[in-house]
């Protein structure tokens, strides 16, 4: 027969209920906050930024980053599709070649958009129009196309 010491005694299966203490008025300095749950009369409003703030945050984020902006798989599909348009035979591409091509393409696009933005600012606008991009390409010349 096993011995039962005070450390190995079983606890009762159900916890015992204690009666609540006599209700006392809460102290004057402390107020309790009650949460009524999801069916509350005034749900918390979602924080909204002012117009343009989110765009400026996004601009700062992408100016700090050095990674690629386009996804690799769609860019590689585009490169393969363009290669099929210009040659009948199937071309194989190394991963490093695709990455180098993507780096060059993104650098070209960033420079083109910054030049087009300067054209829009010169025209006293902040919105880019296709004519700004066309003017930027025309000013750059043939060797930069």
From Swiss-Prot:
Gene Ontology cellular component annotations, sorted alphabetically: chromosome, centromeric region; nucleosome; nucleus
InterPro entries, per database record: Histone-fold (IPR009072), Histone_H2A/H2B/H3 (IPR007125), Histone_H3/CENP-A (IPR000164)
Residues bearing PTM Phosphoserine: 19
Superkingdom of origin: Eukaryota
Feature: compositional bias, Basic residues: 1-19
Pfam families: Histone
Ranges for region Disordered: 1-54
SUPFAM superfamilies found in the cross-reference section: Histone-fold (SSF47113)
Keywords annotated in UniProt: Centromere, Chromosome, DNA-binding, Nucleosome core, Nucleus, Phosphoprotein
UniProt region (H3-like), positions on chain: 51-145
GO MF entry, a single one: DNA binding
CDD domains: HFD_H3
Subcellular localization: Nucleus; Chromosome, Centromere
PROSITE patterns, sorted: HISTONE_H3_2 (PS00959)
Family in the record: Belongs to the histone H3 family.
Quaternary data: Component of centromeric nucleosomes, where DNA is wrapped around a histone octamer core. The octamer contains two molecules each of H2A, H2B, CENPA and H4 assembled in one CENPA-H4 heterotetramer and two H2A-H2B heterodimers. CENPA modulates the DNA-binding characteristics of nucleosomes so that protruding DNA ends have higher flexibility than in nucleosomes containing conventional histone H3.
Job description of the protein: Histone H3-like nucleosomal protein that is specifically found in centromeric nucleosomes. Replaces conventional H3 in the nucleosome core of centromeric chromatin that serves as an assembly site for the inner kinetochore. The presence of CENPA subtly modifies the nucleosome structure and the way DNA is wrapped around the nucleosome and gives rise to protruding DNA ends that are less well-ordered and rigid compared to nucleosomes containing histone H3. May serve as an epigenetic mark that propagates centromere identity through replication and cell division.
Name assigned to this protein: Histone H3-like centromeric protein A
Natural source organism: Danio rerio (Zebrafish)
């Amino acid at each position: 027969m096993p011995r039962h010491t005070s450390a190995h005694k079983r606890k009762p299966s159900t916890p015992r209920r204690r009666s609540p203490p006599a209700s006392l008025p809460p102290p004057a300095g402390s107020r309790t906050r009650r949460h009524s749950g999801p069916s509350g009369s005034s749900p918390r409003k979602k924080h909204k930024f002012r117009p343009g703030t989110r765009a400026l945050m996004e601009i700062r984020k992408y100016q700090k980053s050095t990674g690629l902006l386009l996804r690799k798989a769609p860019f590689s599909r585009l490169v393969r599709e363009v290669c099929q348009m210009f040659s009948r035979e199937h071309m194989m591409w190394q991963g490093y070649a695709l990455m180098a091509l993507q780096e060059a393409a993104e650098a070209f696009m960033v420079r083109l958009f910054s030049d087009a933005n300067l054209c829009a600012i010169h025209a006293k606008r902040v919105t880019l129009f296709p004519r700004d991009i066309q003017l930027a390409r025309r000013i750059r010349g043939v060797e930069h196309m």
